[in-house]
Swiss-Prot record:
Gene name in the database record: LIG4
Binding positions (ATP): E302, K304, R309, E362, F409, E469, K474, K492, K494
Major location (coarse): nucleus
Entry superkingdom: Eukaryota
PANTHER family documented for this protein: DNA LIGASE 4
Name used for this protein in its record: DNA ligase 4
Cofactor(s) for this UniProt protein: Mg(2+)
EC number, UniProt record: 6.5.1.1
Positions contributing to Mg(2+) 1 binding: E362
Membership in a protein family: Belongs to the ATP-dependent DNA ligase family.
The species this protein was found in: Candida albicans (strain SC5314 / ATCC MYA-2876) (Yeast)
Compartment(s) of residence: Nucleus
Gene3D superfamilies given in the database record: BRCT domain, DNA ligase, ATP-dependent, N-terminal domain, DNA ligase/mRNA capping enzyme, Nucleic acid-binding proteins
Amino acid sequence: MTYFLNDIRPPSPNDITPSFTLLTKELFDKLDGVRKESLGDFRTVTEKKAFIIKTFINTFRTHIGNDIYPSAKLIFPEKSGRIYFIKEVALARLLIKMYKIPKESEDYITLHDWNKSYQRSRRFSIDEKKIRDLPLQASRIISKRRPIVDKLEEYTVPQINSSLDQLALEKVSQGQIDILKPLFDNLSIPEVRWLIHILLNKSILTSMERFFFNTWHPDGYRVFSICNDLQKTLQFSTNPDLRLDPSQLAIHPCFKFKPQLSERLTTSYKTLVKKLQRKHEMDPPYEKKFQELGLENKFYIEEKMDGDRMLLHKDGDSFKFFSRRLKDYSYLYGESFQFGALTKFLAHAFAGNIQSVILDGEMVAYDYERNVILPFGTLKSSAIQESVRQFTTIDQYEQQTAYPFFLVFDILFLNGKDLTNYPLFFRKNILNRILRPIPNRFEVLDTRLGSSSEDIERAIREVVSSRCEGLVLKNVQSKYEIDGFRNPDWIKVKPEYLEKFGENLDLVVIGKSPAIKNSYMCGLKSVTDGVYYSFCTCANGIEIEEFDKIERLTHGKWIKTDVSMPPESLIKFGTKIPTFWIHPSDSLVLEIRARSIDTRAGTSYAVGSTLHNNHCRKIREDKSIDECVTLQEYTHIKANYINDLNKAQTALGKKREPVYSLDNESKLKKVKVESDLFSGIEFLIMSDKREADGEVTTIEEMKAMVKQYGGKIVNSVDLATNYQIMVITERELPVSSQYLSKGIDLVKPIWIYECIKRGCVLQLEPYFIFASKNWDNFNHMVDQYGDSYIIHHPLNIVVPKLSESELEDLRNGFDWGDLKPWIYLFKGLSFYVCGNNLSARFLKERIERFSGDLSKHFIECCYIVIPDNHSRPLMLREIDKMSNQISREMVIDKNGGSSRIPHFVTEAFVQASIKMNYIPDPDDYKFR
């Protein structure tokens, strides 16, 4: 069948052949030169860039012609389809060889050690942005070392493209030099810089790409989104006033597009159910089908698979497989019924009248011996070995017990008809009618109907019991939107794990503080006022290559905060100010994972809290700043987190003994008085005492201690008493203000311990005071630095102005630098190690060596670790028992929140944590 995208013809040749100079001077240089300080009559950076692009396109149409595709291959290098196999380090080494740069020279060191410690230690000694920009640095070195010529040669766009096409075929360094050296010797230095940028396949237009497409033709970006083909996008029409029909803008088989994505759960189950049950008006035929299927107040519940999101395209006997990130895996899974790891089994998988179809699903690796779906990382090797197996008679591949298994959950196109605008229940009905499942090779993903929060709870328990990834809940009427749209009618739900904080948050970079290792400040956008509020700072987990990528993508966009602060209508910082700030529209997205939320951040960040022990998982180039977590979403996440902290942190849901009870009073009466240290003092103890390591001394334990040393315990304050009154607390409570208004000081529990330790009643000093209206009376008891004359205090007490989080920042940045204290790597985390063989004992020792806690109860730990050396069948049976018990005893409240559960991880999780000196995502080390 012929489709619109198959029938696009190149426009007539241009009147004039465009030069490379035209692109660099009229587009690249001008866009790169846009600064907030030089906007002129334009209100924003984006507005000025839009004007530059419009002017360039008008100039091109008027003076050059309608065939912009050859030029677009240079304007959009990352979309040109050319791969040069030249990364930054390889390019730097190529330049050394090309210009015979001596080993001891400054230029040699700059290029040879581009990604090594030389750059990290030296990069801020001169203009930082220049030394981090390889194209700029390389062009500067080339300008000094290339032969001097009387007149530079002007290259045309076809000439540059021809050279780059040759380069894409050349794998030998000398051949690459022969192609590139004439260009480097004869282009102007600014052109050399942009050519290097193109060689590295880096985006030039960045956030203005969509605008460029739509300026060329109003349907431009939509066409690009349905095919991701630069040539077809820029050649489908020479008349921007001639719009395409909706049928032409529909998806086409064998043309790649980004699939629809799901949102994460941000509300209670009860609210979510109401949202998923929401009904929209439909045409009579669909309404009739809706009622026939009994879908009133129902929603779909599907298992979230641990695989590779994949779109299967079938057109006649031809197949295409495209991943979520548009990578073509057809060579692996098959392009025909004859060959391929999957397609060779699909000859009878479709109904006889199916000519063309697009299916959305998840590609997983299935182990037929163990009858389990394997972790995501095993998928590619399984597919490769399955593909090779069909071409060999050698039985070396017979040991491979896994192969690709495609689970389909949606149909988007059928026999020339785009189905994305049809309701999901209609699409699923079609899907079940046209497919003939091949067991454990090609099946429709099981879908069940739910109608209440109890249905979600049951499904979550099953997920926990089977150690699966989670659920996806879908509105039965939901439509499908391509291009990576996150549909609010598709919600992913995952079990909550026994980490203090297990969310991966996509955050916008808004600031930077240069150091040996850059740290990037991220912010949250408020949907109410559009302002970005500073939230956290991250440096861990970013590889040198990623640091370089961030610097490339944001080059020239940074503004020094000591020169110009951002307007408060755009960005709000707390007391922690980065060295540079960047406009969010010029920035990028980082995926950040943290161990906990630190609510003690105070005014350091504008949000009022921050992420503790965070690290960057990756740069999210596939996400725009508008797809990140908002301030309001984070507020909800934080509320759930704090609520979880207030609950028992185990799946057992044990009830704590009430603080005040008749039984407690009777126990207190039985305490024997052994000293008169506190005689004449009445104690009202209002809070527990919590140590930095998490150890808690309860109110009842302190009461017993006070009574043991002769103190009197009271439950309220009587101002007429003859006793001295001591109100003990280290928490702000609703009644605190009442006592302060009566002139009563609030004293920390540590005072009780210090008195007992020294055997005398100590005077009250600032160190012991939690809150008071009489601070002046205490300040004279310490020296000018706040240090007591009689009591030794640690540094964080001598400098009480610094919060714990600020002290932690100072320790990390000053005391340790890059040599972080590995000994505290697992501090605050508990592990249950399966087995008791030699391997398990060694593993336990390693965990304890890095300050991890070993738990005797698997339900109460953060991570259940399976050592490498074990009997797999025995271990699987044991783990299945654990999973079932965790599922049974998991507590789910009425709001859909649940007690947290442990991760099942392999020994590699512990080893990787120690190697990287931070806690990686346990999903990457899941045990199956």
